């Protein structure tokens, strides 16, 4: 892969099907027009890839708009390219893109973990109330208890989870499918498992408390 070079004129002579077959082998493009750049972006997208396009000129704007992630130069880039892009490199340093990807992945992971923590705790509360209702026992939580749990014992740890720094292996992970939401099958299974375990621990303490007070 990456052993071919193509000029704009040669690209014009290719059909979309021919370009799709060759695009993964082309590493250098020369004298390409804005239309050529759009075709290159579309060819990679048809292969199921998430495409990022960098540019700084007016002629780059259409492809920047077409790409999944258009990246414009903040210092040397034109206003047209900046308006078309979804991300602007304020220092014109391509290494910053890698840092941005790492930060984005870390933010997404932290949000997901914080949501998982909150939903697991709420699941445990629901299961505990359901258990005591079915068993004919006194409700384990008063409204003020639930308010305290949601405002303090859940919110503060969730904020801490949301501020976790990125680890060194974050960029080694495979990119996630952009069509996949947060509530995946694994997420739901983990949420229910943790919620059940917390509910069991809470109800065990509840029964111990009842037995102790009755003794």
Question: Each predicted region: which residue ranges?
Answer:
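Membrane-embedded transport module
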Residues: 2-53, 67, 72-215
């Amino acid at each position: 892969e990456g052993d071919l070079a193509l000029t704009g004129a040669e690209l014009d002579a290719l059909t979309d099907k021919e370009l799709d077959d060759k695009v993964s082998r082309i590493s250098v493009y020369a004298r390409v027009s804005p239309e050529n750049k759009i075709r290159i972006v579309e060819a990679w997208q048809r292969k199921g890839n998430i495409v990022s396009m960098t540019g700084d000129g007016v002629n780059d704007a259409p492809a920047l708009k077409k790409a999944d992630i258009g990246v414009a130069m903040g210092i040397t880039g034109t206003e047209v390219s900046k308006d078309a892009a979804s991300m602007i490199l304020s220092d014109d340093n391509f290494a910053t893109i890698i840092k941005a990807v790492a930060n984005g992945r870390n933010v997404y992971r932290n949000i997901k973990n914080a949501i998982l923590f909150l939903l697991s705790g709420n699941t445990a509360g629901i299961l505990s109330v359901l258990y005591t209702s079915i068993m004919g026992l006194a409700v384990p939580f008063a409204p003020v208890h639930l308010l305290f749990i949601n405002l303090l014992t859940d919110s503060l740890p969730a904020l801490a989870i949301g501020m976790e720094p990125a680890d060194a292996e974050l960029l080694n992970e495979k990119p996630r499918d952009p069509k996949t939401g947060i509530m995946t099958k694994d997420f739901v299974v983990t949420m229910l498992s943790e919620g059940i375990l917390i509910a069991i621990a809470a109800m065990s303490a509840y029964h111990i408390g009842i037995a102790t007070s009755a003794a």
